[in-house]
Amino acid sequence: MKRRIFTFLLAAALVLLTACSSRGVVRPPVRIGGAIGEASLLRSYSAAEAFQEADTVALVRVGDWLGEQDGGFPITFYKAAVVKSYKGDLPREFTLMQNGGSAGTYEDYPLYTCGNELLVFLRKADADYPDAYQSVGSFSTVLYAADAVDGTRYYLDRFGLMSMREQETGDSALEQPLSRMPEDTVKELRADLEKTDALLAESLSSGERKNSSFEAYVYTQDALETLFASLNQG
């Protein structure tokens, strides 16, 4: 009896941690849309600018795919759960929006899948799903979490757009190019990502990137948390 109770509690904990359905993971129908769109951003954001612009900032875990909205460029909706909050009052479970869907996605920006951990800078949005939030600056401010073997957590700026803005404004020198990191560390990050998202893990190799005009950068969690703490103090 005790073993059965323990098994039940463990299963319940896993469902809570992943925000994925207890009836089975619901993933998007495709990761890459039928058409490839080219993004034209009105502006880019440094980490500090995105933090100040956002209603809420948090490390979140993507859960089940909920659906899509067509009309113009598609939007996809997911369940998501807060792992750690840095700004604002984001509900523990909420709806995360992503630009892209089955009809089309941006180049080198696949749809999320259950288990992705993201550091996101969010604004409240109007949608048919409850507690919906979308990223400030679309994909340009989405940072993917990955852990090295020694426990160091890194955040991957896959397109380097936030990092480029850091260099323009001189806000900080928080980031470093992925290409300059030790090869062993990059392999460790790729292996960690492969646990939940093999497609994302492949993108860590610059030779496998379809869009070679962008260079990935990485931040350490410690560096970003120090920045966020200073911004919260005002």
Please identify what each model-predicted range represents.
Residues 21-27, 106-234:
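Netrin-like (NTR/C345C) domain of secreted extracellular proteins
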Residues 68-81:
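Short aromatic-glycine-enriched beta-strand elements
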Residues 22-53, 177:
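N-terminal, intrinsically disordered, polar/charged segments of Gram-positive cell-envelope systems
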Residues 16-19:
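C-terminal motif of bacterial Sec signal peptides marking the signal peptidase cleavage site
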Residues 91-109:
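Beta-strand/loop nucleic-acid-binding surfaces
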Residues 64-71, 86-88:
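Short, conserved beta-turn/loop elements at beta-strand boundaries and strand-helix junctions
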Residues 1-9:
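Bacterial N-terminal signal peptides that target proteins for export
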